[in-house]
Amino acid sequence: MLNFEHNLLYYNYRFSHLKTAKAHGLVAPHKPLLLLAVMELVEAGKIDSPRIMLSDELVSTFNHNAQFYDPEVEHYHPNIGMPYYHMHSEPFWRLVPREDGVTPNVTSISGLRHHYLYAEIDKELFSILFDVESRVSLQTTLIETYLKHD
């Protein structure tokens, strides 16, 4: 149990310190929105392994979250390709290239699907997402850190 709690603290820290773009004094919400979408699909049983496919359902959930949390955003447009690719700068997210090994900096959905099989999150993080209290803790961290507007 101690290791599980240690891991939850680690991922709460990582989630509250994401490397995000900034423009006009605002933090880009894309990475938090993507992580929230992943958590929703894990909870719904639509993602059942640490492999995060760039599925139509993930795209739809991301877009729904973008509209829900930031409906009037002016400086950022919800493009899941940006965070899906740039999440590789986070220590818990890896892009898995296709067999040709070509790994270009591509952020279009079609380009990502062409060059990458999937993204993979840490197994420890995936396990944490199955625990309701832990998942809520991580969701709260993302919302309060990046998406809560006064």
Mark where each language-model region is.
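Intrinsically disordered, charged low-complexity linkers and terminal tails
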Residues: 1-150
